[in-house]
Amino acid sequence: MIANATANRKIAHLVEFAGFSLTAISDFSKYFKALQANIENYIIAIAVKDTPGLCFTDALYADMQRIGVTVNLTKKHWYGYAAIIDGGKLLAEDAAYQKVISVKATTEDGVAVVATSKPLKVGNATAISFNGIGRSVSRRGINITVYDKTKKCVCDSVCFDTHVKSIDCHR
């Protein structure tokens, strides 16, 4: 119960201070559609923890392509993956089987972004930071942190567990 209360306060804080509805979306496809709708205002960092999952599909990849992702994680069980996207422009992206992946970029606005992915057997973690401040849910699956360039702050941090058919959403 305490964990839920803490999570609810965190979400309320993000909504109150960033003013965005991303935090209300828990469906994978709808989330990427919402990102695409306001892509010019977002810096998006993605990192996989554990595995992209056995339930990652070509349809989910098509959703991710909306924001500039070019690596298809379908059938990439145990792969590390990380990407940084600024305003729809892919700044960095990498993937490899059972390898720690870390990508870094500085945006045109001067925001330093780092995204690190560690599959299960090589660390089982993620780390995403904007200007040195870490923000990652760090749960199994696709971890996404979104920075709003107009507000100059993180407006959402979410994980979609693509290893289960229900594609559970965690914040």
Please report, for each region that a protein language model flagged, where it lies by residue:
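Short acidic-hydrophobic catalytic motif
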Residues: 1-171
